[in-house]
Amino acid sequence: MVNAAVHKVRFEPVGVDMDVMEGETVLDAAFRQGITLMHGCKEGQCASCKARLVDGDIELTKYSTFALSDGERDTDHILLCRTLAYSDITVELLSYDEELMHRSIAVKSYQATLTASTALTHDIRLLTLSIDAPLRFWAGQYVDITIPGTGITRAFSMANAPVNGTQLEFIIKKYSAGAFSSLLDGGLAPGAPLIVKGPYGTCFRRENRPGPLLLIGGGSGMSPLWSILHDHINSGEQRPIRFFYGARTQPDLFHLEQFAALEKSLPDFRFIPALSHADDDAGWTGERGFVHEVLQRSLHTDLFAGEVDAYSCGPTPMIDAVLPVLQLAGVEPEHIHLDKFTPALR
C-alpha cells in the first residue's frame, strides 16, 4: 500500500476519527490503529460489524447476503470488514461498546514456533506456541495463525490467561478435512514456523463485575472460556461461576480433574457438562441433552443475586440456541458476550 491515498473515517455517535488507506478495509484500519470495533469473522459472514454509511464513497468486497441483505444494502448499511473507502467517510455504528473501545489493543504480527501438540480427546488438541515478543490481549480474544508459504490462515482463541508472556496455548478441534487442524497429528511438527497476528475479538472478560458469571461452550469453545475463567481467578474477584460445556459423549470431555479441583478451591463454582448423546451411557450420572437445554433447566433452579454476565463460545448453531435462553432468563443484552465459530472461507 505504498503511496496509497489516505482518507478520514468518522465514527458516530462515539465521535472517533481515524485514517484508512485505499485498498485497506475500514475494520483492518481500525485494528492497525488500536480502535476495537464490534466484529466477529472478519470475512463478511457474521454481521457483527454491520454499520450504516452516512456520507462518502465506498466499495463493498464480497460478502454473504445472510450477513447483509440486499434491502439493508439499499438503505446504506455496510459491513466494516468488507468496506473500502474512496473518500472521507462518516459511519454510524449500530453496535458499540464504550468499554471495548477504551480497552483497545493494536493488532500486530509475531513470528511463532510450534512447541507442542497434545491430544486432549480423540479430536481436541492443545496447541502450544512460542512467539518472538510478548502478546498483550484480553482473556477471550483470538489471533489469526498462518502457516507460511501455504496460504492457510485460521483464527484460534487463546486458552491461557493473558500474562504478557511469549507462550500461547490453544484448544483446537481437529477436523479430518480441515486445512489447518488436519495437520495437527503429524503434518505440523514441533519446531514448525508460524505467523501469529492479533489480538482480535470482542468476547473478552469484563472486569470488576459483582454478579454471577455464566460460561457456556462446546467443542473448541472451551479455549476462550478457559482463558476467561483463569483470568477471573487470577484477578482475585469473587463471584458465583457456572461453567456449562456441551459434548456428545463422556470420551469427548477433558480437563475434568482441573474442574474438580476448581470446584473444591473456589467458593461458588460449578462445572456442568451436558452430553447430547448419552442415552446409551448407563454410567453417566450428569446432565443429558444439548447445552442450551441444560442451561435453561439450570437457570430455572439456580437462583442468582445481582446482574449476570454471560459468555458463550462455540459453533454457530449452539450460540443461536443459547442466546434466546439467556434473553428469556432476563440477562441484559449488554451483559451477553458471544463468539460464534464460523467456517473458514480459505
PLM region spans:
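Short, surface-exposed secondary-structure boundary micro-motifs
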Residues: 54-57, 94-96, 148, 199
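Histidine-anchored nucleotide/phosphate-binding helix
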Residues: 226-234
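Ferredoxin-reductase
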Residues: 102-193, 247-249, 274-278
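Reductase modules of NAD(P)H-dependent flavoproteins
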Residues: 1-89, 240, 244-346
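Short, structured interface segments
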Residues: 78-102, 192-196
